[in-house]
């Protein structure tokens, strides 16, 4: 029983160390610049703009439109509007 407690504490400590640090050490998304000079983030020429939300990035509801979430996705796959699996969402960075 003692081994299980020690293993549990070590697992929680490892998870805490692997968690991202708050404050100035957060990872910033690569937005690819601004869109037409209006300071709105835009995707680079090598990326496609994909709209999705949470698990909707991988499995989209048929006919669902974009809400407030937008992602830049680097992929050679075509944009599949209304498809069940969005291939572009597998390599994405969120646009703020």
UniProtKB/Swiss-Prot annotation:
Cysteine pairs bridged by disulfides in the record: 43-72, 51-66, 52-57, 73-92
Gene null: resulting phenotype: Does not affect pathogenicity in a corn seedling infection assay nor the production of microconidia.
Stretches that traverse the bilayer: none
Leader sequence residues: 1-18
Location relative to the cell: Secreted; Secreted, Cell wall
Keyword terms of this UniProt record: Cell wall, Disulfide bond, Secreted, Signal
Main function: Aerial growth, conidiation, and dispersal of filamentous fungi in the environment rely upon a capability of their secreting small amphipathic proteins called hydrophobins (HPBs) with low sequence identity. Class I can self-assemble into an outermost layer of rodlet bundles on aerial cell surfaces, conferring cellular hydrophobicity that supports fungal growth, development and dispersal; whereas Class II form highly ordered films at water-air interfaces through intermolecular interactions but contribute nothing to the rodlet structure.
Family: Belongs to the fungal hydrophobin family.
Name of the protein in question: Class I hydrophobin 3
Gene: HYD3
């Amino acid at each position: 029983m003692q081994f299980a407690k020690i293993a549990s504490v070590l697992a929680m400590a490892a998870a805490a160390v692997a968690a991202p640090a708050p404050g100035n050490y957060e990872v910033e998304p690569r937005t690819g610049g601004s869109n037409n000079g209006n300071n709105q983030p835009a995707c680079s020429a090598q990326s496609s703009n994909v709209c999705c939300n949470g698990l909707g990035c991988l499995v989209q509801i048929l006919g669902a439109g974009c809400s407030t979430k937008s992602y830049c996705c680097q992929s050679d796959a075509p944009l599949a509007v209304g498809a069940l699996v969005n291939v572009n969402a597998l390599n994405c960075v969120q646009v703020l």
